[in-house]
C-alpha cells in the first residue's frame, strides 16, 4: 500500500492499514470513518455528498438519499474492500430516483451494479458486454456470495 495513505486524514475519513485497525465501528466514531483500503475513500466521500442533494435533484421531485441509505451504501463499499480484491477499481456512486444509491464497479467488459433502496433492501445485477447476466439481492453477510460476485468482476481485468 502506498505510504502516502498510511495516515491520511480528511474531514470524514481516516485511513489506517488493516493490520493496525481491523475493526471499524462508524457509529461510535461520529464523523470519522476508518477504511480498509485507499480505494474506498473517494466512493465513500461521494456517497456522503449525496445527502446534501436538494429535493427534486432529478427534476421529478425525488428526495436525496437518507442517512440510513447512505450508511448502507458505505457498508457495501466497506464489505467489498474487506473481500481482498485489490485489483478492482473503486465504484462510481450515483443517486437513484426515489432516494436510493447506486454503486457501479467496472472491470473490462464486466460491470457489477449494487443498488441500495430507501427501504434498506440492496439489489445487484452483473452485466457483461452490456447484457444483464444475473440479478438478485446483494448479500452483506455471509460474504461468500459477494466474494463470488467480485471474483467474477475481477476476472474481467
Language-model-derived ranges and their functions:
Residues 1-92, 126-157:
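Eukaryotic low-complexity, non-globular regulatory regions
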Residues 73-118:
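Amphipathic, interaction-prone secondary-structure segments
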Residues 111, 117-123, 127-128, 132:
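Long, acidic/polar E/Q/S-rich protein-interaction regions used at subunit-assembly interfaces
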Amino acid at each position: 500500500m502506498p505510504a502516502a495513505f498510511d495516515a491520511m486524514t480528511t474531514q470524514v475519513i481516516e485511513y489506517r492499514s488493516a493490520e493496525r485497525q481491523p475493526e471499524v465501528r462508524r457509529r461510535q466514531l461520529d464523523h470519522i470513518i476508518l477504511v480498509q483500503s485507499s480505494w474506498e475513500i473517494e466512493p465513500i466521500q461521494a456517497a456522503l455528498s449525496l445527502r446534501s442533494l436538494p429535493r427534486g435533484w432529478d427534476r421529478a421531485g425525488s428526495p436525496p438519499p437518507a442517512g440510513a441509505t447512505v450508511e448502507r451504501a458505505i457498508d457495501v463499499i466497506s464489505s467489498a474492500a474487506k473481500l481482498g480484491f485489490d485489483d478492482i477499481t473503486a465504484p462510481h456512486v450515483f443517486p437513484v430516483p426515489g432516494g436510493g444509491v447506486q454503486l457501479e464497479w467496472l472491470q473490462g467488459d464486466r460491470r457489477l451494479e449494487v443498488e441500495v433502496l430507501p427501504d434498506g433492501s440492496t439489489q445487484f445485477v452483473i452485466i457483461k458486454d452490456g447484457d444483464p447476466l444475473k440479478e438478485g439481492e446483494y448479500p452483506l453477510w455471509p460474504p461468500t456470495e459477494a466474494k463470488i460476485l467480485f471474483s467474477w468482476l475481477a476476472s474481467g481485468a
